[in-house]
């Protein structure tokens, strides 16, 4: 076995339980990883210098193939209604087969860190079969200083071997694809998929498991900071505008996807961004677009022409095209990945039913209710005749990555909001003037104006009314915004149709929240929406 590259001399590949007749490359830099990826025909270089890779069959995560080892340490800690268990015996068989499979491979190792707060940082060793995967994770996690690598000791190991095929009978899994996590030993095994996002989300899941016990709230959110040190957190599911709205040039970007909130403030879990590129344009999102033309960026499943020029409008391979780049590629990004206590928490939803106001102020109990609900709505795709929006509830705005019961995260959030007197806002970037198909999308200028008023504090002194369905406080007037749009019912031509739609959405909220009734306190249950018919 040949080992090359910079590493801790007492922490070779054997500490991960691996040995190989091939070469082990430790902590290669971008140019070295480009050379290896091109030499192995894993990827090509775009016309502008980015590394372009395809993931084959799997162009997204495989949540049905993700398992957590069920043992004495996790039995009462994991939310098993939402996480698939794997026996210790099955994991051991899988681990042995992973080791055997790796014996003939060249391996790429990156020693990295999850978490910009030194007190809560998780040193992670990521072992990959592909050089481009090594570059991807090097972009996404936090890189130690080169001098620190000589003393690096991992507390978590991720082994990603796409050419490995799991055996459902032998390994207790569902298909040949597997993402298996042993949270006691902090080992993650990824096989049968080339989708790079599995590595990033495995580290996120581990931090979501570890940090609550330390009083730190892990969050699937973006975050930014104003010039006065005012920090804002943006929760939101895919398609709600989380990345776009937090990428405000006048504010410092702390991170776009994963953060922790603890006694000293908030901190990014990552050192990079994994942005969607479908329909990406230089005009609409110039900073993200610029990263796609830089050496070091990974373009995942992006279609390029014979000259290596990307076509971001081409979704023929997948709509889930991505670019992965280090955070310092964004000019207004934070250098530390850390900031103080938040002043505002924004919960984004894209309500395609046209019922919710464009902005509402939440009490701590209402904030916990809507955080646990994690509501947005998907709109119809290209199927003929499909016109109805579909409600989506993803608790904590990130159910697939939350190993503990949602109430653990919800209680942490409520306590932190109360302790630091944080203002909480629900912002609807969805439909107004009717539901999807009748109304129209909330103008981005309106959303930005309302968000600006919330973040600069001017909305605090506004006059509010109580929403008759959801019970939260809605501003009556905001400078620069048409007052009509603030009251969704008034934007509908058919007021009775609005009332029917509102009742329908409220009933969905109530039905979804039933599973949390025994896990939350009375004030949170009382924050549940009620049908109170509005007057004409």
From Swiss-Prot:
InterPro entries: PEP_carboxykinase_ATP, PEP_carboxykinase_C, PEP_carboxykinase_N, PEPCK_ATP_CS. Substrate binds at residues 61, 195, 201, 322. ATP binds at residues 201, 220, 236-244, 285, 322, 447. Its cofactor is Mn(2+). Pathway: Carbohydrate biosynthesis; gluconeogenesis. GO terms for molecular function: ATP binding; metal ion binding; phosphoenolpyruvate carboxykinase (ATP) activity. Binds 1 Mn(2+) ion per subunit. It is found in: Cytoplasm. GO terms for biological process: gluconeogenesis. Pfam families: PEPCK_ATP. It catalyses: oxaloacetate + ATP = phosphoenolpyruvate + ADP + CO2. One of its GO terms (cellular component) is cytosol. Mn(2+) binds at residues 201, 220, 257. Transmembrane segments: none annotated. It is an enzyme of class 4 (lyase). The keyword Metal-binding applies. Keywords: ATP-binding, Cytoplasm, Decarboxylase, Gluconeogenesis, Lyase, Manganese, Metal-binding, Nucleotide-binding. Involved in the gluconeogenesis. Catalyzes the conversion of oxaloacetate (OAA) to phosphoenolpyruvate (PEP) through direct phosphoryl transfer between the nucleoside triphosphate and OAA. Belongs to the phosphoenolpyruvate carboxykinase (ATP) family. This is Phosphoenolpyruvate carboxykinase (ATP). It comes from Chelativorans sp. (strain BNC1). The gene is pckA.
